[in-house]
């Protein structure tokens, strides 16, 4: 499968999950031609769906873990416990990604709004529908640039998603401009600024959803695993995942920083003990 094929397949799986649907082996075979790999991937997905539903991952990330979950974990094998940790990380990563995309879209729309303000300043107030017409032309140029970059292969998956989101928002703003029939450029800009506030609120909501889920995940991890190997894996993966690292760096998470610090100290302590043991062996052999 090509890189583009994997991207399309990943997008499809994300869409299925958002709709509450499950991808079966027949669907997987449309993207993965190798029979054994398709079977293995299908088996992995089945296990993923099973643990996700059995443990109620979304409930855990909402801070509403069922008591039965903790009872089941007491007798669960290590690989099953790690699978649950992986599912929690996947759910968090989806929220971190959504927050990052909402942030990127808001930033891009803000930059577009500033350009529109500069353009409006050059328009005489007596031109009928002038702001809406200019805004439409700016939108057309933005869409054309997106198409050009996409065809040239210059856009990453995230960059393309952001530009498509921005264009969808701009179309809504243009519709509001035409509906309001703003009499002047200042009135038109004030309307757009009000529209931007809704987008800013959407960004704040995505950030809050991710932060809340992260806190709920730590609550669950502490109650279910304390400072065991599962917690080590959880914190380590948060450190290694780009979306998680970026979100935590920007928004903070005291418990993450504390656990990460403790893990670093434990690592240094273990390394020192190994050095001391090696030194003792060298002296013992003299």
Put a short name on every predicted segment.
Residues 1-141:
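Alpha-helical lid/collar subdomain of P-loop NTPases
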Residues 86-286:
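Charge-biased C-terminal accessory regions appended to nucleic-acid-, cytoskeletal NTPase
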């Amino acid at each position: 499968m090509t890189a583009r094929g994997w991207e399309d397949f990943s997008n499809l799986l994300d869409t299925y999950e958002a709709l509450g649907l499950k991808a079966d082996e027949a669907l997987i075979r449309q993207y993965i031609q190798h029979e054994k790999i398709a079977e293995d991937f299908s088996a992995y997905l089945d296990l993923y769906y099973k643990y996700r539903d059995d443990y109620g991952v979304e409930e855990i990330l909402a801070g509403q873990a069922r008591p039965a979950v903790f009872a089941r974990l007491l007798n669960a094998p290590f690989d099953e416990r790690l699978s649950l940790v992986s599912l929690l990380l996947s759910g968090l990563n989806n929220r971190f990604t959504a927050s990052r995309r909402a942030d990127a879209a808001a930033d891009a729309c803000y930059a577009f709004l500033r350009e529109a303000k500069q353009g409006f300043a050059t328009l005489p107030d007596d031109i009928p529908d002038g702001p809406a017409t200019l805004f439409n032309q700016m939108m057309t140029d933005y869409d054309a640039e997106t198409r050009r970059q996409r065809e040239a292969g210059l856009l990453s998956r995230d960059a393309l998603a952001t530009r498509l989101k921005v264009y969808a928002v701009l179309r809504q703003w243009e519709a509001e401009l035409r509906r309001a029939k703003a009499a002047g450029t200042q009135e038109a800009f004030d309307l757009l600024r009000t529209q931007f506030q809704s987008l800013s609120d959407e960004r704040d909501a995505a950030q809050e959803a991710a932060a809340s889920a992260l806190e709920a995940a730590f609550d669950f991890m502490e109650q279910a695993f304390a400072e065991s190997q599962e917690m080590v894996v959880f914190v380590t993966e948060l450190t290694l995942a780009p979306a998680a690292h970026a979100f935590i760096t920007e928004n903070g998470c005291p418990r993450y920083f504390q656990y990460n610090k403790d893990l670093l100290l434990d690592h240094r302590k273990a390394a020192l003990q190994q050095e001391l043991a090696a030194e003792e062996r060298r002296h013992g052999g003299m």
